[in-house]
Amino acid sequence: MARREKLLEKMRRTPAKIRFAEVHALLSYEGFVLFNKRGSHRSYHHADGRLMTIVVPHGRHKTCHPTDVRKVLEAMRR
């Protein structure tokens, strides 16, 4: 669980510098399953019914939008 804790702490400190792979890893640790890949959006579903859609950065952007990172952090609090 050390990697999960480090990812959460990094997201809290600097939400503007989080890559999509890190968001995907944290959602996987929390039990979210990728169920829809359409274009630049990835949708995740949790067994308890929670849904989450994350926009994959493209072009020159390397990191996820801070709003998406905050949305993931809010889902972790529940």
Listing of model-derived features with the role each one plays in the protein:
Residues 1-29:
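A charge-rich, low-complexity, intrinsically flexible signal that marks solvent-exposed coils, linkers
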Residues 57-78:
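C-terminal structural segments of small proteins and small subunits
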